[in-house]
Curated annotation (Swiss-Prot):
NCBIfam families: L_lactate_LldD, PRK11197.1. The lineage of its organism: Bacteria, Pseudomonadati, Pseudomonadota, Alphaproteobacteria, Caulobacterales. PANTHER family: L-LACTATE DEHYDROGENASE (PTHR10578:SF85), S -2-HYDROXY-ACID OXIDASE-RELATED (PTHR10578). This is L-lactate dehydrogenase. It catalyses: (S)-lactate + A = pyruvate + AH2. Belongs to the FMN-dependent alpha-hydroxy acid dehydrogenase family. The gene is lldD.
């Protein structure tokens, strides 16, 4: 099929994947209202089209956390990415490095830190949850440092997992889940061979040293779910700071007061995020939450955002609302599932092209010229 947008990548991924995997990446919590609003609220932001401006020197380059990159984007941490394409984290990391943007590896990745680091020609970021087992966390942070990870993305919006009803219907969870997944895989022979057979081992690579290489994926996920720590408080971040000396980015901030608290404890950055609509349904979309948060913290830390970004135009919208950079989650997984690493490369090229067009038509040449002044008055 012809692919010219993230919507096309999504459709190609739907055709390629068993339902349980497609719905896992595509779905959200409860009735998925916040998931939908992430996309619609951002798409509804109107820009000012300007004319007769010299836009012959458009550049999408920026610097995040002291590292220059070609685009103000990073590939977000997405669990089980290695189930969407053969050794999916490796393929995505290579594509990100080739484009000059960061790849963030999830704690619950199929490929472990060492494998991804060896395969990538550029340093990676690493994402971490607060777990009850502090010894495991300490070991994981040490392994991240040894693997050359340059930034830690610490997820703060998951003291407990969200209620994701679609997973029970699709076979990711629920009655007879394993049998339902097997039947679905039979009808997706391309995926079954490429990932199901050639993509082994299907383990959570970063957790395997604790539970063993032969532990099943469901047991890995069960152990992880039981280890989320709902008692975490702001004071616990002092412990993280003691273990990690590089940039610390808190992911999952949706309230200005929490953003200011992040700045107070010395975080280097935050990600304005509702976990892609996968945690608490009914909260603000990222696009609606972002302006107040950016205003509340000013330049005290670097504000990133995710949620609903499906194009380079959406990236420009997020920058105009106050973000310095954007994380791409579902979009890159759709591309990975559809066409592997080359699909991720194609997506990033598309994002850059769309950004350049949007910048030229709003009359700006550089990212520091993108602010609320390029928004239509109704959206400022």
């Amino acid at each position: 099929m012809i692919i010219s947008s993230t919507t096309d990548f999504r459709e190609a991924a739907r055709r390629q994947l068993p339902r349980f995997l497609f719905d896992y990446i595509d779905g959200g919590a409860y009735a998925e209202r916040t998931l939908a609003r992430n996309v619609s609220d951002l798409a509804d932001i109107s820009l000012r089209q300007r004319v007769l401006k010299d836009v012959s020197r458009v550049s999408t380059r920026t610097t995040l956390f002291g590292v220059e990159q070609t685009l103000p984007v990073a590939l977000a941490p997405v669990g089980l990415t290695g189930m969407y394409a053969r050794r999916g984290e490796v393929q995505a990391a290579r594509a990100a490095a080739a484009k000059g943007v960061p790849f963030c590896l999830s704690t619950v990745s199929v490929c472990d830190l060492a494998e991804v680091s060896r395969a990538s020609s550029a340093p990676i970021w690493f994402q971490l949850y607060m777990l009850r087992d502090r010894g495991f966390m300490r070991d994981l942070l040490a392994r991240a440092a040894d693997a050359g990870a340059t930034a830690l993305v610490f997820t703060v919006d998951m003291p407990v997992p969200g209620a994701r009803y679609r997973d029970a219907h699709s076979g990711m969870t629920g009655p007879n889940a394993a049998m339902r997944r097997l039947v679905q895989a039979v009808f997706k022979p391309g995926w079954a061979w490429d990932v199901g057979v050639m993509g082994r081992p299907h383990t959570l690579g970063n957790v395997a040293p604790v539970l063993g290489e032969n532990t099943g994926l469901e047991d890995f996920m069960g152990w992880l779910g039981a280890n989320f720590d709902p008692s975490i408080q702001w004071k616990d971040l002092d412990w993280i700071r003691d273990q990690w000396k590089g940039p610390l980015i808190l992911k999952g901030v949706l309230d200005p007061e929490d953003a200011k608290a992040a700045a107070d404890i010395g975080a280097d950055g935050i990600v304005v995020s509702n976990h892609g609509g996968r945690q608490l349904d009914g909260v603000l979309s990222s696009a609606r939450a972002l302006p107040d948060i950016a205003e509340a913290v000013g330049d005290r830390l670097t504000v990133l955002a995710d949620g609903g970004v499906r194009s380079g135009l959406d990236v420009v919208r997020m920058l105009a609302l106050g973000a310095k950079g954007v994380l791409l989650g579902r979009a890159f997984v759709y591309a990975l599932a559809a066409r592997g690493g080359p699909g991720v490369s194609q997506l990033l090229d598309l994002i850059e092209k769309e950004m350049r067009v949007a910048m030229a038509l709003t009359g700006v040449n550089t990212l520091d010229q993108i602010d609320r002044s390029i928004l239509a008055k109704t959206d400022r």
